[in-house]
């Protein structure tokens, strides 16, 4: 579920929040982060206490979200960078390496062409 949310997200779908670790980290915006950022929310605990509270709950959220629970899907979040919107599809590591290799070959051939001119 989180991977699907990442693939659909843009940089505006992220938030810096202390809700997971007690320290600021960029995460996918979700009902979880919204609740922690609301004025009525308690202050997150300092690290390492906040993860001791948050991670068991988020593990259960992820488990329920994978099972299709709508409320859990809305709560599910994970760490991301601002470039999350650049990811548009899920590729295997092998595919990424092969594409990188082909890009290198293409660049090398273009460079070689410049040297011949």
Task: Please place each PLM-identified region on the residue numbering.
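Conserved active-site-proximal phosphate/metal-binding subdomains
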Residues: 1-117
């Amino acid at each position: 579920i989180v991977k699907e949310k990442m693939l659909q997200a843009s940089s505006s779908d992220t938030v810096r929040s202390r809700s997971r670790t007690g320290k600021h980290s960029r995460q996918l915006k979700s009902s979880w982060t919204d609740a922690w950022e609301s004025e009525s929310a308690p202050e997150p605990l300092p690290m390492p206490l906040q993860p001791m509270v948050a991670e068991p709950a988020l593990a259960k959220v992820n488990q329920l979200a994978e099972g299709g629970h709508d409320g859990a899907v809305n709560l599910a979040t994970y760490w991301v960078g601002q470039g999350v919107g650049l990811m548009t599809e899920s590729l295997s590591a092998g595919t990424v390496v092969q594409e990188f290799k082909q890009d290198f070959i293409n660049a090398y051939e273009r460079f070689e062409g410049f040297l011949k001119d």
